[in-house]
């Protein structure tokens, strides 16, 4: 057995539904492509739906399976709407891959309270509440992993 086939048999993701937050960004798109190439069905979730759609088309052209979904992790309604949409389409979520995040390069003395709140709402609060929403689904399924 060749190494690639062996690794795919051990680490393959066939039949697994993976929700990726921040999927259209640089790191998110690379992770999403890798998950799809390992056989996962990837729900590409991000604020820029058009970029998610383009990535889904690129993954499909490479033989993978992906779908695009709008998600703003700083918006609780957006979180629940996205999770509901993914579950409706795939009937399950096996893995949540948290990639969404923002940053603004400013010195400590220059960060405005509004900037700090926006970063924390996305990077901390958003990560917590998308994980909570997906965990509820995973609890119902009696399986799942959050990364």
Map each language-model feature to its residues.
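Conserved glycine-rich cofactor-binding loop
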Residues: 24-26, 48
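The beta1-alpha1 cofactor-binding region of Rossmann-like NAD(H)/NADP(H)-dependent oxidoreductases
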Residues: 49-50, 71-82, 113
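A short, exposed helix-loop element centered on a Lys and neighboring polar residues
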Residues: 131-132
